């Protein structure tokens, strides 16, 4: 079946769904509308989909640290969220990338690999395709991250490493603290 044959591509569930509903699948040049269609060894399966989106481009300047045909790495400043919200926010990193693509006449997708909180600054990797996003997200646990944090209270050392689980501070949506119920950073 087509759906079994494409498993070798390790497509994300979301991308496979997008291909089935909004894209095109052909087997030996013939368009297929049923993922359960039988295929044989040697059949040529072609998957087509669009990276177009309805993101509103913005003129927010970007601090680009690296770019190639597959990805974009942006230094996100404080006060910016990654994705547009249901309330219609257009001052997000995704909107800024859409604006950059429009100005540079780049036709690519906008797929952030991970998110940083609104007030957290740092590098954000943006894949230019859904397949690239999936491939990079599989290596998520191999990415080294280092955070610099402001702390309050008495500290024995001027600098150091906090290697403890962190979680949200009670009643605060964007403040974090060391806590037994937290997660490893």
Model-predicted segments: where are they?
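RNA pseudouridine synthases
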Residues: 1-185
